[in-house]
Amino acid sequence: MRILITGGSGFLGQALTQALLGRGDEVLILSRDTSSNARNKQASHWLTSLEEIDAPIDAVFNLTGANLFSRPWTKARKRQLRDSRIALTESLVNWLAKQTQAPRVLLSGSAIGFYGDQGERELTEQSAQGHDWAAKLVADWEQAAANLGVRTVYLRTGLVLGDGGLLQPLRPLFKCGMGGSLGDGQFWYSWIHLQDWVSAALYLLDHDSANGPFNLTAPTPVRYEQFAKDMGKTLHRPVWLTPPAWLLKLLLREQASLLLGSTKALPQRLQQIGFQWQYSQLSEALEAILKPTENS
């Protein structure tokens, strides 16, 4: 297949690109990042504009979006976060709609932040949208992709664990014994190994009846307290420092909701269509990611 990936230079996009190329697909990457590090990946084509595309596209992965944690959420930054997702998705959909041949499927980025903080409630794809700013951001991002008139899948992604992503800033903290539980540690984290995220994305690409939202998480969410214990055990480090919730809220303000919010998302629809996880237990996922690094 001929596949376009927007945001292909990011953590998820790079892993997805390698998997697609590995199975023989032609991959076109549209990216704002034109640095040598990003362009060094073995994509079939690198693009800085949709107008450079000169032949029909079979499928699109829309993964564009600025990092939610890289800067404080000022009013200007919030506009950037929305524009990098919603405005760019609207531009993509408008461009695709004008082509003589539309893609067969659009798989658009999303997040379990759609549900917001819902405490102990188990959340499936049928659960209601949350009410905080991040939940509205995700809901509007999905809506921006909704009007192309082709099969559309929303990749409601949980916390992706791999060599990079969430673990990159956490690993040095845990190695220094500073990776203790956040707040009371009782909130839920819905996670997924990077390899399973890629496999699920490909499964949804190839599964012609898959449509609408899918939670891309492991079937076994954990409380953050357990996440911290498993991290410490894998790295052979004590877990003792526990920053209080009030301090995190003071330092991070609205962004603290992404760390302290409880989102117990379950991948009900992936299970219903027969997807199989390689890493369904957090301890196994962390061992696979962290042990090779520790031994190298």
Regions found by a protein language model. Give the residues of each.
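Mid/C-terminal beta-alpha module of Rossmann-like enzyme folds, strongest
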Residues: 2, 207-254, 287-296
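N-terminal Rossmann NAD(P)H-binding glycine-rich loop of SDR-like oxidoreductase domains
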Residues: 3-22
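NAD(P)H-binding glycine-rich loop region in Rossmannoid oxidoreductase-like domains
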Residues: 42-91
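Conserved Rossmann-fold NAD(P)-dependent oxidoreductase catalytic core, especially the SDR/UDP-sugar
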Residues: 90-131
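Conserved beta-loop-beta element that borders a ligand/cofactor-binding pocket
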Residues: 110, 143-163
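Glycine-rich "substrate-gating" loop/helix at the edge of Rossmann-like oxidoreductase active sites
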Residues: 128-132, 156-164, 184-194
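Alpha-helical substrate-binding/gating segment
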Residues: 171-179, 187-221
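C-terminal amphipathic/interface module of NAD(P)-dependent oxidoreductases
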Residues: 257-296
